[in-house]
Amino acid sequence: MPFFGNTFSPKKTPPRKSASLSNLHSLDRSTREVELGLEYGSPTMNLAGQSLKFENGQWIAETGVSGGVDRREVQRLRRRNQQLEEENNLLRLKVDILLDMLSESTAESHLMEKELDELRISRKRK
């Protein structure tokens, strides 16, 4: 039996009102654009005097020149960068192979020296 009367019972909250009575949320994007003129286009920004536009997941310069560098020059530099990365990978592979060959020849020379020392010792005993 509780000391202070009835057990705790909060009063019931009133039901929520409908958030929106308009049917805009039920319209698809193309219908909204036609009916309401909500054609936003792709996002654009101006950064350091350069106008950029977001298309297909990438920011692209709207003008042909990007910060004083031509698009063809950028593509050429990217291709050259790719070639240099591939050459770098090939050279790393060659260095690894040469290190393996060096360690193998070093191990063989140590074995030969050991056998030679054993032969010298056995020859002195006879």
From Swiss-Prot:
<dbReference type="GO" id="GO:0033504">
    <property type="term" value="P:floor plate development"/>
</dbReference>
<dbReference type="GO" id="GO:0036126">
    <property type="term" value="C:sperm flagellum"/>
</dbReference>
<keyword id="KW-0539">Nucleus</keyword>
<feature type="modified residue" description="Phosphoserine">
    <location>
        <position position="20"/>
    </location>
</feature>
<keyword id="KW-0282">Flagellum</keyword>
<keyword id="KW-0221">Differentiation</keyword>
<comment type="subunit">
    <text>Homodimer. Homodimerization is essential for nuclear localization and interaction with KPNA4 but is dispensable for interaction with CTNNB1. Interacts with polycystin-2/PKD2 and GM130. Interacts with the C-terminal region of CTNNB1. Interacts (C-terminus) with TCIM (C-terminus), TCIM competes with CTNNB1 for the interaction with CBY1. Interacts with FAM92A; this interaction facilitates targeting of FAM92A to cilium basal body. Interacts with CIBAR2. Interacts with KPNA4.</text>
</comment>
<keyword id="KW-0963">Cytoplasm</keyword>
<keyword id="KW-0597">Phosphoprotein</keyword>
<protein>
    <recommendedName>
        <fullName>Protein chibby homolog 1</fullName>
    </recommendedName>
</protein>
<dbReference type="GO" id="GO:0055007">
    <property type="term" value="P:cardiac muscle cell differentiation"/>
</dbReference>
<feature type="coiled-coil region">
    <location>
        <begin position="67"/>
        <end position="125"/>
    </location>
</feature>
<dbReference type="GO" id="GO:0008104">
    <property type="term" value="P:protein localization"/>
</dbReference>
<dbReference type="GO" id="GO:0005814">
    <property type="term" value="C:centriole"/>
</dbReference>
<dbReference type="GO" id="GO:0030178">
    <property type="term" value="P:negative regulation of Wnt signaling pathway"/>
</dbReference>
<feature type="region of interest" description="Leucine-zipper; mediates homodimerization">
    <location>
        <begin position="77"/>
        <end position="98"/>
    </location>
</feature>
<dbReference type="GO" id="GO:0090090">
    <property type="term" value="P:negative regulation of canonical Wnt signaling pathway"/>
</dbReference>
<keyword id="KW-0206">Cytoskeleton</keyword>
<dbReference type="GO" id="GO:0051289">
    <property type="term" value="P:protein homotetramerization"/>
</dbReference>
<dbReference type="GO" id="GO:0045444">
    <property type="term" value="P:fat cell differentiation"/>
</dbReference>
<keyword id="KW-0333">Golgi apparatus</keyword>
<feature type="compositionally biased region" description="Polar residues">
    <location>
        <begin position="1"/>
        <end position="10"/>
    </location>
</feature>
<dbReference type="GO" id="GO:0036064">
    <property type="term" value="C:ciliary basal body"/>
</dbReference>
<comment type="function">
    <text>Inhibits the Wnt/Wingless pathway by binding to CTNNB1/beta-catenin and inhibiting beta-catenin-mediated transcriptional activation through competition with TCF/LEF transcription factors. Has also been shown to play a role in regulating the intracellular trafficking of polycystin-2/PKD2 and possibly of other intracellular proteins. Promotes adipocyte and cardiomyocyte differentiation.</text>
</comment>
<dbReference type="GO" id="GO:0005813">
    <property type="term" value="C:centrosome"/>
</dbReference>
<dbReference type="GO" id="GO:0042803">
    <property type="term" value="F:protein homodimerization activity"/>
</dbReference>
<dbReference type="GO" id="GO:0042802">
    <property type="term" value="F:identical protein binding"/>
</dbReference>
<keyword id="KW-0969">Cilium</keyword>
<dbReference type="GO" id="GO:0060271">
    <property type="term" value="P:cilium assembly"/>
</dbReference>
<dbReference type="GO" id="GO:0016607">
    <property type="term" value="C:nuclear speck"/>
</dbReference>
<comment type="similarity">
    <text>Belongs to the chibby family.</text>
</comment>
<dbReference type="GO" id="GO:0008013">
    <property type="term" value="F:beta-catenin binding"/>
</dbReference>
<dbReference type="Pfam" id="PF14645">
    <property type="entry name" value="Chibby"/>
</dbReference>
<dbReference type="GO" id="GO:0005634">
    <property type="term" value="C:nucleus"/>
</dbReference>
<keyword id="KW-0175">Coiled coil</keyword>
<dbReference type="GO" id="GO:0045892">
    <property type="term" value="P:negative regulation of DNA-templated transcription"/>
</dbReference>
<feature type="region of interest" description="Disordered">
    <location>
        <begin position="1"/>
        <end position="26"/>
    </location>
</feature>
<dbReference type="GO" id="GO:0060070">
    <property type="term" value="P:canonical Wnt signaling pathway"/>
</dbReference>
<dbReference type="InterPro" id="IPR028118">
    <property type="entry name" value="Chibby_fam"/>
</dbReference>
<feature type="region of interest" description="Minimal region for the interaction with PKD2">
    <location>
        <begin position="60"/>
        <end position="112"/>
    </location>
</feature>
<dbReference type="GO" id="GO:0005802">
    <property type="term" value="C:trans-Golgi network"/>
</dbReference>
<dbReference type="GO" id="GO:0005654">
    <property type="term" value="C:nucleoplasm"/>
</dbReference>
